Amino acid sequence: DGVCATALAPPGNCTDHPLWPPVVGDWVALADAAQNHGEAAAHAVEIMPRTSYIERPAASGFGLSQAIAANVDELVIVEPLQPAFSIGRVERFVAIAHASAIRARVVLTKADLVAGQEIQGAIEQCEPLVESVTALNTTDTQAVAELKESFTPGDTLVLVGRSGAGKSTLTNALLGTSLATGKVRAADGKGRHTTTSRQLLQGEVNIIDTPGIRALGATPDAEAVDQTFTQIAALAEQCRYRDCSHSGEPGCAVGQALTQGDLSPEVLGRYQRMRRESERNELNRDARLARQSQRTASRDNTRGRRETMRLKGRGN
């Protein structure tokens, strides 16, 4: 029989561990199992080393982030074609995948609601970003079966996207499960949060379904942003100045490509906005971590002084 880990707060000082608390996808060591109302309860005492860790930055900035999952092999970006496909949102998710050093793919849903020209346009925008782009209707069993065959058996996938994108519907189709799905408002095409927590569902592939994300900040990893916009990163290597901001400096290869029509101004604009936000989030994150480190050091010093006083009291 399995053991149910009903206590996340472990004995001892495990909460001081840098990996604490555990997130969906974590492997944990359990101890102190005891029978409780016919079920085994246990304390999680250690988090096993992670192969990957995905977090998303808060849209508000301030260096805050929210964990998505751990030990994931592939980020599946579920982006609806209706009511409004957003390449900017896809780019931000791809940057998060690069920051986590995992693969990413794009699944374009609601392909039955738009014209073929729109589908092809969305695919062409996504293709430079990821290795695999699929457009489908989640009720098309053959298309879903082909998508399922493209996954590596045994991999752990995490589905991310906006509310109403069809993540839970896609999960149901892939695994034959029955997660709750919600209706999409006809007025604006936005869905409600039917998935309110992250959960790991096991099958031929392990799928983590996540709540919809309404606003997505830029990863604080500026290098991951450059990895997302590969065309601009390659051009930047040819700029005269290493710290070129691509804003009109002499010898700017990016500006030259823009003038010659080889680079879209919309792509450059999205890159510059994400890069600026990424650098700002990185500064805020580093400042927050420094404050946390100071508080931890102060707490440890206080504990040390108390222990010293206790030992001195014993000596008397």
Where do the language-model regions lie?
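Canonical P-loop GTPase G-domain recognition
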Residues: R103, D112-A165
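Helix-rich effector regions associated with P-loop NTPase G domains
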Residues: H17-W27, A31-A41, M48-N71, R103-A104, ...
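Conserved ATPase-coupling elements of RecA-like P-loop NTPase cores
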Residues: S86-V90, A115-Q120, G217-D221
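Switch/coupling subdomain of P-loop NTPase systems
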Residues: H43, G63, A70-V72, P83-I102
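Beta-strand/loop nucleic-acid-binding surfaces
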Residues: G2-P22
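Structural motif
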Residues: V76-V78, V158, I207
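Walker A/P-loop
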Residues: S163, K167-T169, A173
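Conserved beta-strand segments of the P-loop GTPase G domain that flank and frequently precede/overlap
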Residues: V76-L81, V107-T109
